From Swiss-Prot:
GO BP terms in the entry: snRNA transcription
An example molecular function term from Gene Ontology annotations: RNA polymerase II general transcription initiation factor activity
Oligomer status and interactors: Part of the SNAPc complex composed of 5 subunits: SNAPC1, SNAPC2, SNAPC3, SNAPC4 and SNAPC5. SNAPC2 interacts with TBP and SNAPC4.
Organism: Rattus norvegicus (Rat)
Bias (Basic residues): 1-11
Compositional bias of kind Polar residues: 308-325
Major place of residence: nucleus
Superkingdom, natural source: Eukaryota
Disulfide-linked positions: none
Name by which UniProt lists this protein: snRNA-activating protein complex subunit 2
Functional description taken from the UniProt entry: Part of the SNAPc complex required for the transcription of both RNA polymerase II and III small-nuclear RNA genes. Binds to the proximal sequence element (PSE), a non-TATA-box basal promoter element common to these 2 types of genes. Recruits TBP and BRF2 to the U6 snRNA TATA box.
Name of the gene: Snapc2
Composition skew (Basic and acidic residues), residue ranges: 293-303
Compartments, as annotated in UniProt: Nucleus
Keywords noted in UniProt: Nucleus, Transcription, Transcription regulation
Length: 359
């Protein structure tokens, strides 16, 4: 037969333990509200007096509940003054934007739906740079290549280690057709070698080149001190698109870190005065009021007055994000004469190092 139903009781070992602060009942909250309203003139309510009126509540519980009420009042006040909180539109309008935020906002308006295409193009540039012969030759151990008309063929690492002077084979990969380029290293056939790039090779040195390859410690050391510029370019390419690149060695990580740290040192070498003048004029053209330029929208871009240079980018910045058809921004870019890869029309001469004045 089924045993009779019995009610389960709380074990005795749990009866003496405190289960935490009990929730405030609506009756207690109304009572506390009446007590606080009666003491409205006081700067701070006294917890001792409130504990005498509220039976069953300690001073700590009353203080904790009052702090919760204060925090709720502050949140409600902020929500009324600033809709959306600190991320709301009113808070963003009252704050003065940083210069980089101004340029980022302008670039987003100019590029419109082409942001993914720009990111892919930047990644492709780094991918192409990974196969440059100079990048392969300046690696440690070097990667001499032979031009066979269709693609670059990478030699094995063992053949690359036999090369006596990889820095001397700088002009080799463009014209060498011998399958064993190590023997024909002294014959430079290509023209236009850069002596500055060939001087970069001695900076990266492999420790103990005469060490036996059989030892595991020696091979791990050579692996840590190996520099593969192809891998570095692939790492930068994948990082620009938010992906995971190949794992870099210790020296390769140091090269990437040195590149990042040298950005601040390279900025003063640019023609800063010319850059400032160009960007100031470009910003003035792109942010020109559109009301006065609406009449110039209908005629073709090449009119007599010089106002069309600012009309094109402005139409692009205002019209392309709101365009419903995907072909609309392309026509706008074509009419404006602005390259999406260079929306601010910065000349390439302004991105190179300025010539030092002759003394």
């Amino acid at each position: 037969m089924k045993p009779p139903q019995r009610r389960r009781k709380v074990p005795a070992r749990y009866t003496g333990e405190a289960t935490g602060p009990t929730a405030w009942s609506p009756r207690e909250m109304r009572h506390l509200l009446r007590l606080l309203q009666a003491r409205r003139g006081q700067p701070e309510p006294d917890a001792k007096e409130l504990a005498k009126e509220l039976r069953g509540r300690s001073e700590a519980e009353i203080c904790r509940f009052i702090q919760q009420l204060k925090g709720r009042v502050v949140r409600e006040a902020i929500r009324k003054v600033q809709p959306g909180g600190r991320d709301g539109p009113r808070h963003r309008e009252t704050q003065l934007p940083a210069p980089i935020e101004v340029w980022m906002d302008l670039a987003e308006k100019l590029t419109g739906p082409l942001e993914e295409a720009l990111t892919a193009a930047f990644s492709q540039v780094l991918t192409i740079a990974a196969a440059e012969p100079l990048s392969l030759l300046h690696s440690k151990p070097g990667k001499p290549t032979k031009a066979c008309g269709r693609a670059l063929v990478f030699l094995s690492t063992q053949d690359a280690q036999k090369d006596p002077a990889p820095e001397g084979s700088g002009p080799e990969p463009m014209t060498a057709a011998d399958p064993t380029p190590e023997a024909s290293v002294p014959e430079p056939k290509a023209s236009g070698t850069n002596p500055e790039t060939s001087g970069l090779v001695p900076e990266v040195s492999v420790p103990d080149p005469d060490a036996p390859t059989e030892s595991l410690a020696g091979s791990s050391t050579e692996r840590d001190f190996a520099v593969d510029f192809e891998k570095i370019y692939k790492y930068l390419s994948s990082s620009s698109r938010g992906g995971h690149g190949p794992e870099l060695s210790a020296v390769e990580s140091a090269v990437v870190l040195n590149l990042l740290m040298s950005l601040a040192e390279e900025l003063p070498h640019l023609p800063c005065t010319a850059l400032v003048d160009h960007l100031t004029k470009t910003y003035a053209q792109l942010t020109a009021p559109q009301a006065s330029l609406d009449r110039e929208k209908r005629p073709r871009p090449g009119t007599e007055d010089g106002g069309t240079d600012s009309t094109g980018p402005e139409e692009t910045g205002q019209g392309s994000p709101q365009a419903s058809e995907p072909t609309e921004p392309r026509l706008t870019w074509k009419a404006a004469g602005v390259c999406p890869l260079n929306p601010f029309l910065v000349p390439l001469d302004l991105l190179s190092q300025a010539l030092a004045p002759a003394r």
